Amino acid sequence: MSSLNPSPNRPASALVTLNGVAARTPDGRGLFDNLTLAFGRERTAVVGRNGVGKTTLLRLVAGLSEPAEGSVTRIGSVGWLAQAQTPADDETIADTLGVAEPLAILHRVLAGDGSLDDMAEADWTLEERMQTALADVGLADLAPNRRTADLSGGEQTRLRLAGLKLAAPDLLVLDEPTNHLDAEARAMIADVVGDWPGGVVLVSHDRALLRRVDRIVELSSLGARVHGGGWDLYVERRDAERAAAERDLEQAERAIGRVQRETQMAQERQARRDRAGKAARANSSDPKILLDAQAQRAEESGARGQRLAERKRQAAEADLAQARERVERVRQLALSMPSTGLPAGRVVLNLNEAVVTIEGDRRLLGPLCLRLTGPERVAVVGPNGAGKTTLLKLIAGLIEPSSGSVERPVRAALLDQQAAMLQADETLVEGWLRLNPQGTPNAARAALARFLFRNVQADRRVGELSGGERLRAALACVMTGAQPPQLLVLDEPTNHLDIDAVEAVEAALSAYDGALVVVSHDADFIENLRVDRTLELKNGQLQPSTTP
C-alpha cells in the first residue's frame, strides 16, 4: 500500500472522514465493514468489481445514505453527480442548475417588480456566471426556461456538471460521469476533474479519466487499499502483485508435492523400522518388560513423526489454498474464445453506396462504401447522434439499406451494451438453446462453462446478471455455437462494466480471430483491441479518423 500522503487513509485537511463504517444491501448482504477513510482536496478514484459497493461508498461520502455502523463526518460542502438521473417533465434548465429561484428574483428586480427583500437578495452576477458555466461544458447560449428533458443524456450530464460549477462545492462526488458520453464530452469531464480547485471523489471505468487522479482506493469485500498515483502506476503495481501471486502458487504447489513425498518416505521408513523391531523382538532374549518399553518408545517416536508430518502437510495445504485463492481472483475472468476459421482473403463485408433514410426520405446515412477482408478490425468513432448504432445495425443485417447494397457472405453477430439478444426472464441455458436451436442442454452447459458460468451459475436468469455478466453471457451464446460468427459487431460494449470486466473482454476479443467492427468512446479499449483502422462517422459519411 502506498500513497502520496504521509498517511494515505487520512489526507491533510480532510473534508469527509469515514470512521469504522459498515454498509449493507437492502436485503442485508454485507458490502464492507469497519472501513476507515478520509477524503480531502485531492482527486481520488474508487475502483473495484461491480457489486462491491462503490456507489454505496460515494453515497455515504455525499451524505445521501447512512452507514449501517460507524460514522461519517463532513466539513464543508459536497456536490453530487449521479450516474443517471431522469428529469421531471416540467424541469427547466434553471431548475437543474439550481438557480431557478435566484434567477426569478433577479428578473423581478430587473423588471421593476421586485420587493425590498428581492433587492437585498438579488445576485447581480448570476446570469454571467451561469452562461460561463454553461459555456465551460459546451452548452453555451442555452435558454434557462428550456425543458431539461429535451436535452440528450450526454447534454443532461454536462448540464448537471455546470450546476456543480455554479455551486462550487468543496468536494465533488461523481459516479461514472463519462458513461454514454462521446469523446469530446469525456475530455471535458477529465478537464473539469483535473482543474477542480477542491477535492474530487469519483467512480469510473474510464481509464483516461483515472489517469487524472492523485490516488486510487481499491475497494473489495476485504476492505479498502489506498494507492498513491494515477491509473498507470496502479496497474503497474497490480500487475506486479499478480505476477507475485502466480509465483507464490507455483512455489506452494512445489512445496505440497515435496511435503507429500517426504511424508510418504517417512511412512515407509517407519514401516521398515516397525518390521525390523518386531523381528528383533521375536528373536530377542531380553526381558519382556524391557522389550515392551522399547516398543512403546518406538511407537511414541513414530507418532511424533506422524504428527509433525501432518502439521507440515496442513500448513502446506493452507499455503496452497491461499495462493490458489489469490490467483483465482485474478484468473476468474479469463475467457476462452473459439476459432472462427476465417480465411485471410475472405471478403467479410462490402457496403456499396448504401443509404439509410428515416421519416420518409430524410437521409440519415450514406452513400456508404466500406470493404472488410479477412480478420480486419475497424473502429468507428463520432459524436453522439451521428448514427453509429444505425450503421452497426446495417452492417449486422438488422436493417436493410434504402438504396445501394450490403454484401455480408459470412455469419455476423451484433452485441450491444444491453446484450439485447438475451431475454430477462430466461435462464442462461434457455437463452443459449434459443440462439443455438441445434444444441443440447449438455452442450449449453459446456459452452457456458467456457465463459465461467459453471454448474448452478448456468441456471441464473438473465435479469439477475450485472452488466459485465450479461455481456459475458452474450459472448458465450454467440461464440460457442456450431458456427461462431466470423464478423463480430460491437456497440459500446464496455458501458456498465467494471474495469476487471473490461480488461477481460479486451483479452477475449484480442484472441478473437474473426473480423471486428466496434463503436466505442473508450480510447483505451480501441487501442487495446489493436484495430487496423479507425473511421469517423460525420454528416452521414465514413471517413478516415484524424484523431490519433
Q: What is each PLM-predicted segment?
A:
Residues 18-21, 30-42, 70, 351-357, ...:
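Conserved beta-strand
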Residues 172-176, 181, 415, 487-492, ...:
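Catalytic Walker B motif of ABC-type/P-loop ATPase nucleotide-binding domains
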Residues 182-191, 495-507, 524:
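Conserved D-loop/post-Walker B switch-helix segment of ABC ATPase nucleotide-binding domains
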Residues 90-95, 222-247, 537-548:
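Conserved beta-strand-loop-alpha-helix hinge in the C-terminal portion
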Residues 1-24, 102-157, 237-358:
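Coupling and communication elements adjacent to P-loop NTPase active sites across diverse families
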Residues 87-153, 416-487, 492:
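ABC-family P-loop ATPase nucleotide-binding domains
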Residues 40-44, 55-117, 215, 375-386, ...:
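ABC ATPase nucleotide-binding domain signature region
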Residues 161, 189, 475, 494:
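Hydrophobic anchor residue at the start of the ABC signature
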